[in-house]
């Protein structure tokens, strides 16, 4: 029996990369996995197959995590499909690097929307469910760049620093209700 047997985890941005690795690890510990990505293409289908081979329930959902309404819909669908939402991993993220003097407003806005606003969207949608369950775990994937900064990545750095602050604030808001919130900041 694994550490997460009987739990349902949402992992955003998990068709490949770090999100996929998180989903696979959680599944190996017995968690059922609902993962999202902008599209569920061949990568997403392969991720579904790999997770299913571990003997857990899995489904990939096409969703724009930066869109508030899309997120509300997909979270409601996941709750309907899986029955509970016990773990949320806010992993969706992108980079659009550039020096400040050359960075466009669109580069800034897109990175903040995908990396930070998406976490707000998913936390906002999952919080009522977790509150009714009186338990839950929210994990924000930040970065060492959110702590130390990095030249040419002011948008990415700001978004990841925001993920850390968001986790700290949510932990204070929801901790008394049995809901944990943490940030993980992988580094070089």
What are the language-model segments listed below?
Residues 2-34:
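Canonical Rossmann dinucleotide-binding motif of NAD(H)/NADP(H)-dependent dehydrogenases/reductases
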Residues 99-100, 107-112:
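Substrate-binding pocket helix/loop in short-chain dehydrogenase/reductase
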Residues 128, 172-176:
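Alpha-helical segment proximal to the catalytic Tyr-Lys
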């Amino acid at each position: 029996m694994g550490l997460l047997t009987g739990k349902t985890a949402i992992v955003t941005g998990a068709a490949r990369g770090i999100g996929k690795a998180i989903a696979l690890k959680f599944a190996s510990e017995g968690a059922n996995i609902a993962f999202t990505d902008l599209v569920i293409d061949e990568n997403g289908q392969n991720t579904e197959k790999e997770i299913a081979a571990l003997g857990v329930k899995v489904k990939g959902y096409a969703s724009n995590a930066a869109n508030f309404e899309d997120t509300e819909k997909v979270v409601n669908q996941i709750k309907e499909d899986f029955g509970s939402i016990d773990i949320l991993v806010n992993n969706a993220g992108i980079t659009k690097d550039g020096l400040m003097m050359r960075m466009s407003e669109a580069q800034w806005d897109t990175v903040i929307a995908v990396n930070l606003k998406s976490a707000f969207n998913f936390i906002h949608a999952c919080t009522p469910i977790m509150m009714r369950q009186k338990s839950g775990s929210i994990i924000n994937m930040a970065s060492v760049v959110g702590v130390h900064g990095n030249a040419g990545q002011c948008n990415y750095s700001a978004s990841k620093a925001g993920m850390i602050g968001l986790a700290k604030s949510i932990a204070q808001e929801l901790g008394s209700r049995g809901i944990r919130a943490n940030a993980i900041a992988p580094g070089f």
